[in-house]
Amino acid sequence: FVAINCGAIPLTLMESELFGHEKGAFTDAKETQAGTFERANGGTLFLDEIGELPLDAQVKLLRVLEERKITRIGGKKAIPVNVRIVAATNRNLEEEVRLGKFRLDLLYRLNVFTIQLPPLRERKEDIPLLAAFFLRKHNSLLNLSIESITPEAMDQLCAYDWPGNVRDLENAVQSAMILCVDRQIHSGHLPARIKSYQMERLIAPQEAEEDTSLRDTNSLAEKARILSALQ
């Protein structure tokens, strides 16, 4: 199993990362290197954020999927590969096709079996479980011993919209852990965007109510002026 994040690789290195290169193929190619397709041969290649793949690379990926062969950059020999492809994206690929950012033929080639995973904002019940998992994970990675997240901080995590989904939540928990000086994460340790989001939600209904009240007052005053003029 080999995983690659298509959104994290510079465009200039994308083809080399996927298909490999021969020694001397370009300036920094000091030795031959196998790409992810060769490394995943006989197994599974996970293409994360495939919606970020540039169009030129999409054409070459489609050719590999159809011919089951790759050619390294600077090479002439076609190398057979037998790879199962699993791809993921947070984009609407049908919309990307309409905008000319993703190839329709590649979408059809990949779209054999699809699993739609709802965004994190639509499965709030998962947030406490995921937050606890990330707490354990980063305790180990960062050599920390933070035990829990306070109910108030957890409420703020659950209320947030999470545009970046699970990765966004993990980054927020990790950031809070770095700032935490005791064994509990408090709301003050959370990123500012999460705290400000909560404040905006509290203020918005009040502003809407005040705005409605002001409109009603202005409307009554206008009616009074009209009636006075008619009399």
Question: For each of these PLM feature ranges, what is it?
Answer:
Residues 58-60, 144, 223:
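A general lysine-centric signal
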Residues 208-231:
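Bacterial C-terminal helix-turn-helix
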Residues 1-84, 93-111, 122-132:
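Conserved AAA+ P-loop NTPase core
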Residues 18, 205-209:
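Intrinsically disordered, low-complexity acidic/proline-/asparagine-rich linker or regulatory tail/stalk regions
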Residues 17, 189, 225:
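Ca2+-coordinating acidic residues in Ca2+-binding motifs
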Residues 35, 63, 95, 155, ...:
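Surface-exposed charged/polar residues within alpha-helices that form helix-capping/stabilizing sites
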Residues 74-84, 92-201, 219:
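Nucleotide-binding/hydrolysis machinery
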